[in-house]
Amino acid sequence: MDEKLSRVDPKLLELLVCPLSKGRLSYDREHNELVSEKARLAYPIRDGIPIMLVSEARRLDE
């Protein structure tokens, strides 16, 4: 994976929130996802773009 695509700008993380819980997100570098612990969802990052759709998120209990 391209190194630039595997990083998330910390300023972006400060602005983005989970669309379901409105809670903070953390970056999971191993899975390249933004994680909402509150909603127990992980949003994928594809081609450097966070996909902030609940329908595209992975449940953390899976």
Curated annotation (Swiss-Prot):
Disulfide bond positions: none
Record-linked InterPro entries: Trm112-like (IPR005651)
Gene Ontology cellular component annotations, sorted alphabetically: cytosol
Gene3D superfamilies named among the record's database cross-references: 2.20.25.10
Family in the record: Belongs to the UPF0434 family.
PANTHER family the UniProt entry points to: PROTEIN PREY, MITOCHONDRIAL (PTHR33505:SF4), ZGC:162634 (PTHR33505)
HAMAP family assigned to the protein according to its UniProt record, in alphabetical order: UPF0434
Protein name according to UniProt: UPF0434 protein RHECIAT_CH0004260
